[in-house]
Amino acid sequence: MEHHSDIDVREQPDEVQEYNKLLTENWDFPLIITTNVQFFESLFSNRVARCRKLHNICNSVVVFDEAQMFPPELLNPMLQMLQSLNYSFRTELLLCTATLPIFDKDLSNKNRDGQNFFCFEEPIEEVVPYDAELFAAFDKVTYHWSPLKLSTDELAEHLLQNDSFLCIVNSRKDAARIYASLKERYKGDDLIHLSRRMCALHIQNRLKEIKERLRSGQSVKVISTQLVEAGVDLDFPVVYRAMAGLDSIMQAAGRCNREGRMPVPGKVYIFRLTEERNANGELGLAQGSLEDMVDQLVRSGTPQQADIEHYYRSFYSKVRNFDAKGVAKLLWGDEDDQKERIRSLRFDYEKASDQFKYIEDHTKQIVVPYGKEGKELIEKIQRNIPLRRNDYRLLHRLSVGIYEKDYLTLGKSILSDGDGILYLTDEQYYSNDIGIDIANMNSELLIVSDGREQ
């Protein structure tokens, strides 16, 4: 059973949808495919509907894909919860990642009272022990670690020296700007933009187009945000990655010569845009940690286990708080009062549930007129035609998140149905090339705050 927001149930009859809804509440199924958001927010919830599934996690095996993406500011409560599942509920945990964080290493620092890293008490066992000679077979790319320092236009010229490429940047604003620069210089139909300026259905269709071009040997030039770095099976001869953390660089490299069919290694370039401001938050910490070890990586070539551990030690030493919302303290308390909390069952589940948000979303979701489905759905909303369950499911796939300032900028182009559904009425502000587009109103649509695409 699949339990996540991208499920397309439009072809399912109502009775099947109702049955599946019950299954998603209790996870009474032998195999569940879900997301970190669903999993962890259920574990930390105090609401009956979300907690109803927890007993089925006992005596199970939980597989986490891309475990390096656990948010640092929530690591303490998340790791403590996972250890509790393992110790008390006999749940086996399998962490899948090319860059395993040091979740089992003690990073205590006496000068950081109350902000220390919680590590697993038992060491993580490697399913496949590291063997340099064995793993050499997976060295499919050559890393160019010394960052290229280029303006947007210089980067565009650099990219167009390749028939096919994937360029990954840190923000939607950068993606749109580089795409515009490429469009000025290149008029081919194989140039594709990907970002969360586009609704999920739009992204899905673009990915299908990219995969078909790659499969048939046609050229394809892609400028994208980080959305292609995990769970997207693409294979390019050359990849450019804006400066980020080592984990992100290696994720991007996984989209280069992925299937190992090239007679020579693929090429991975790292670059910094000269117009780019110093990043804040998680992205800034990650960039700083990578820059500190560029010389070491140049010597290594392909990152080794020691390089990955060095990176995470550096990165985690810069993180200010691994329990930024105080969730772990609400549930487990300090060492001094932990036993008393357990004896008296004094746990503040309600506040912990309110504070634990796997993804902080400060955007407004706007339904956009993408394709026939988007236009028809907006027409239904405008004509006050009652929406069916399938329509509500489709709302998610046709929505884009925008920030308050951009919501205000779009002004009268966004209307509400009165029940909380916002929709874009002016089609000129949704482009088939880049999605939401308000460049004509002289407004930058999005900003970078913590390294996650926004």
Task: Label each region the model flagged.
Residues N26-N46, R213-E229, R241:
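Conserved two-lobed SF2 helicase motor
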Residues S42, V220-F236, Q251-E259:
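SF2 helicase motor core recognition
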Residues T99-L160:
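Interdomain hinge/linker at the junction between the two RecA-like core domains of SF2 helicases
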Residues M1-F44:
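Inter-Walker segment of RecA-like/P-loop motor cores
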Residues P77, Q83-S84, F138-K173, R177:
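Conserved interdomain hinge at the start of the Helicase C-terminal
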Residues V37-F40, R50-L85:
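SF2 helicase catalytic motif II
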Residues E2-V16, N170-K173, L191-K208, I223-E229:
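Conserved helicase motor
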